[in-house]
Amino acid sequence: MKYDIIITITLKEGMLNPEAEAIRHAIAHLGYVTDRLVTADQFRITLDADDKQKAEEMAVQICERLLANPVIHKYEIEVF
């Protein structure tokens, strides 16, 4: 069965994020006040798996082995 997976990778709290800071400052130059800005990478994958749980397990392996550095990143997985 085919499952659609959405994986969102963000930096863990406390990690420096120069990209987010640059965007936040640019937003301030536009006249808007922001308290916080988070950047993320999002991946949409279609996987073949026996069931939803297997699809999620496969997505976890993809995150841990390829997409995310567990020292600095956290990830969220949605399976449809």
Report residues per predicted region:
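Long, contiguous binding/interaction regions
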Residues: 1-80
